A protein has these predicted regions:
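A conserved FAD-binding loop/helix module that cradles the flavin
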Residues: 114, 134-157
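A glycine-rich dinucleotide-binding beta-alpha-beta segment and adjacent secondary-structure elements
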Residues: 15-21, 76-138
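Conserved FAD/dinucleotide-binding core of flavoprotein oxidoreductases
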Residues: 34-68
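FAD cofactor-binding and catalytic pocket of flavoenzymes
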Residues: 1-46, 97-113
Length: 162
């Protein structure tokens, strides 16, 4: 895994040896897919746009690489059963969402920027400046972002009492 992260963050290249996060929302919410079918979300870490990866050329090839790996490991038969798919690249994050270099998750996931070391939800310099989102405590991803909002909500409630 360390070699994979080194390729992404230090060498800024795509790797054939990928890791991914796989989520199946239809397992807990049947409305996420037509009856008898499933919905999956796959998150694959890739380098940001400082890498100069040409996503117009590489996007479909990389998607096929991801499907091949899932087909050989956790979801045999996935390739021939996909009804509809799409993917987002760092280009989308940079152009449509105006994130720096197409970064989808804020700061680099390393120990010195994790857990307590992430940006705190209240500025240590300006007393009325607050932060919420993927780059703040407690962390990235949708659960982290929602938890960050909850932390801030609790902080405001605590300040109102005291």
């Amino acid at each position: 895994y360390e070699k994979h992260l080194d390729k992404i963050f230090e060498k800024k290249i795509l790797s054939d040896d990928i890791s991914y996060y796989l989520h199946r929302p239809s397992a807990t919410d049947p409305n996420m897919a037509p009856e008898g079918q499933d919905a999956f979300y796959v998150l694959v870490p890739v380098p940001n746009n400082l890498s100069k990866v040409n996503w117009i050329e590489e996007g479909d090839k990389f998607k096929d690489l991801v499907l091949d790996k899932m087909d050989k490991t956790v979801l045999p038969g996935i390739k021939e059963n996909v009804v509809s798919d799409f993917y987002l690249t760092p280009d989308y994050f940079e152009i449509d969402l105006a994130t720096l270099y197409g970064s989808g998750f804020s700061i680099q996931p390393k120990f010195s920027q994790s857990a307590y070391f992430r940006f705190h939800n209240q500025s240590e310099i300006y007393k009325n400046l607050y932060f919420v989102g993927a780059g703040t405590h407690p962390g990235a991803g949708m659960p982290g972002v929602l938890s960050s909002a909850k932390v801030l909500d609790n902080l405001f409630k605590w300040k109102a009492i005291y």
